[in-house]
Protein backbone atom coordinates (compact mmCIF):
# COMPACT_ATOMS: atom_id res chain seq x y z
CA UNK A 1 0.00 0.00 0.00
CA UNK A 2 1.28 3.50 -0.80
CA UNK A 3 2.06 6.16 1.80
CA UNK A 4 -0.77 8.31 0.43
CA UNK A 5 -3.28 5.47 0.60
CA UNK A 6 -2.16 4.42 4.08
CA UNK A 7 -2.63 7.96 5.36
CA UNK A 8 -6.04 8.40 3.71
CA UNK A 9 -7.28 4.99 4.88
CA UNK A 10 -6.13 5.70 8.42
CA UNK A 11 -7.79 9.11 8.48
CA UNK A 12 -11.00 7.67 7.05
CA UNK A 13 -11.04 5.14 9.90
CA UNK A 14 -10.23 7.88 12.45
CA UNK A 15 -7.01 6.18 13.52
CA UNK A 16 -4.93 8.09 16.06
CA UNK A 17 -2.38 10.28 14.27
CA UNK A 18 0.49 8.80 16.27
CA UNK A 19 -0.61 5.29 15.28
CA UNK A 20 -0.51 6.51 11.67
CA UNK A 21 3.07 7.67 12.20
CA UNK A 22 3.95 4.21 13.54
CA UNK A 23 2.25 2.53 10.58
CA UNK A 24 4.21 4.65 8.12
CA UNK A 25 7.67 4.37 9.72
CA UNK A 26 8.63 1.35 7.56
CA UNK A 27 8.11 3.43 4.40
CA UNK A 28 10.56 6.13 5.51
CA UNK A 29 14.17 5.60 4.40
CA UNK A 30 16.61 6.89 7.02
CA UNK A 31 17.92 10.42 6.34
CA UNK A 32 15.43 10.98 3.54
CA UNK A 33 12.47 13.34 3.23
CA UNK A 34 10.24 10.59 1.80
CA UNK A 35 7.29 10.15 2.27
CA UNK A 36 7.07 13.80 3.30
CA UNK A 37 6.77 14.98 -0.29
CA UNK A 38 3.83 12.62 -0.81
CA UNK A 39 2.08 14.07 2.24
CA UNK A 40 2.68 17.66 1.13
CA UNK A 41 1.16 16.87 -2.27
CA UNK A 42 -1.81 15.24 -0.54
CA UNK A 43 -2.26 18.38 1.57
CA UNK A 44 -2.17 20.46 -1.62
CA UNK A 45 -4.74 18.13 -3.18
CA UNK A 46 -6.98 18.63 -0.14
CA UNK A 47 -6.76 22.40 -0.62
CA UNK A 48 -7.67 21.98 -4.27
CA UNK A 49 -10.49 19.55 -3.45
CA UNK A 50 -12.17 21.99 -1.04
CA UNK A 51 -11.84 24.91 -3.44
CA UNK A 52 -9.26 26.92 -1.53
CA UNK A 53 -7.84 29.63 -3.77
CA UNK A 54 -6.42 33.14 -3.70
CA UNK A 55 -9.96 34.45 -4.06
CA UNK A 56 -11.34 32.12 -1.37
CA UNK A 57 -8.47 31.09 0.93
CA UNK A 58 -8.57 28.55 3.73
CA UNK A 59 -7.63 30.44 6.91
CA UNK A 60 -4.50 29.06 8.59
CA UNK A 61 -5.11 30.79 11.90
CA UNK A 62 -5.90 28.11 14.46
CA UNK A 63 -5.35 25.28 11.96
CA UNK A 64 -3.43 23.10 14.42
CA UNK A 65 -5.72 23.83 17.34
CA UNK A 66 -8.89 23.09 15.38
CA UNK A 67 -7.80 20.24 13.14
CA UNK A 68 -4.86 18.63 14.92
CA UNK A 69 -5.72 19.07 18.61
CA UNK A 70 -3.99 15.83 19.59
CA UNK A 71 -0.61 17.42 18.80
CA UNK A 72 0.92 20.06 21.04
CA UNK A 73 4.08 21.44 19.50
CA UNK A 74 6.66 23.55 21.34
CA UNK A 75 9.49 25.76 20.16
CA UNK A 76 11.20 24.28 17.11
CA UNK A 77 8.37 21.78 16.69
CA UNK A 78 6.02 24.70 15.99
CA UNK A 79 8.39 26.02 13.34
CA UNK A 80 8.67 22.59 11.71
CA UNK A 81 4.89 22.20 11.59
CA UNK A 82 4.52 25.74 10.26
CA UNK A 83 7.06 25.03 7.53
CA UNK A 84 5.21 21.87 6.45
CA UNK A 85 1.88 23.73 6.41
CA UNK A 86 3.30 26.58 4.33
CA UNK A 87 5.21 24.23 2.00
CA UNK A 88 1.98 22.37 1.23
CA UNK A 89 0.24 25.67 0.49
CA UNK A 90 3.16 26.67 -1.73
CA UNK A 91 2.83 23.42 -3.70
CA UNK A 92 -0.89 24.04 -4.08
CA UNK A 93 -0.05 27.52 -5.35
CA UNK A 94 2.27 26.18 -8.02
CA UNK A 95 5.70 26.64 -6.47
CA UNK A 96 8.26 24.01 -5.51
CA UNK A 97 9.71 24.64 -2.04
CA UNK A 98 13.36 23.75 -1.50
CA UNK A 99 12.79 21.00 1.06
CA UNK A 100 16.38 19.84 1.32
CA UNK A 101 17.72 23.33 1.98
CA UNK A 102 15.15 23.82 4.73
CA UNK A 103 15.27 20.47 6.50
CA UNK A 104 19.07 20.25 6.59
CA UNK A 105 19.19 22.71 9.49
CA UNK A 106 16.63 20.65 11.43
CA UNK A 107 19.38 18.16 12.25
CA UNK A 108 16.79 15.45 12.70
CA UNK A 109 15.12 12.94 10.46
CA UNK A 110 11.54 13.99 11.14
CA UNK A 111 10.43 16.18 8.23
CA UNK A 112 8.14 13.44 6.92
CA UNK A 113 6.28 13.36 10.25
CA UNK A 114 5.59 17.09 10.19
CA UNK A 115 4.45 16.76 6.57
CA UNK A 116 2.08 14.01 7.75
CA UNK A 117 0.74 16.26 10.52
CA UNK A 118 0.21 19.06 8.00
CA UNK A 119 -1.61 16.70 5.62
CA UNK A 120 -3.87 15.45 8.42
CA UNK A 121 -4.72 19.02 9.42
CA UNK A 122 -5.40 20.06 5.83
CA UNK A 123 -7.58 17.03 5.03
CA UNK A 124 -9.63 17.61 8.19
CA UNK A 125 -9.88 21.34 7.43
CA UNK A 126 -10.90 20.64 3.84
CA UNK A 127 -13.63 18.26 5.00
CA UNK A 128 -14.89 20.85 7.46
CA UNK A 129 -14.91 23.55 4.80
CA UNK A 130 -16.80 21.26 2.41
CA UNK A 131 -19.25 20.27 5.15
CA UNK A 132 -18.59 16.54 4.80
CA UNK A 133 -17.15 13.91 7.14
CA UNK A 134 -13.39 13.34 6.99
CA UNK A 135 -14.14 9.83 5.73
CA UNK A 136 -15.83 11.29 2.63
CA UNK A 137 -12.97 13.70 1.98
CA UNK A 138 -10.52 10.79 2.22
CA UNK A 139 -12.56 8.69 -0.20
CA UNK A 140 -12.73 11.55 -2.70
CA UNK A 141 -9.01 12.28 -2.37
CA UNK A 142 -8.18 8.58 -2.77
CA UNK A 143 -9.91 8.64 -6.16
CA UNK A 144 -7.57 11.38 -7.34
CA UNK A 145 -4.43 10.08 -8.96
CA UNK A 146 -1.88 11.54 -6.56
CA UNK A 147 1.53 10.09 -7.25
CA UNK A 148 2.37 6.55 -8.13
CA UNK A 149 5.24 6.60 -5.62
CA UNK A 150 5.07 4.19 -2.67
Set out the residue ranges of the language-model regions.
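Solvent-exposed interaction surfaces and binding hotspots enriched for charged
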Residues: 1-150
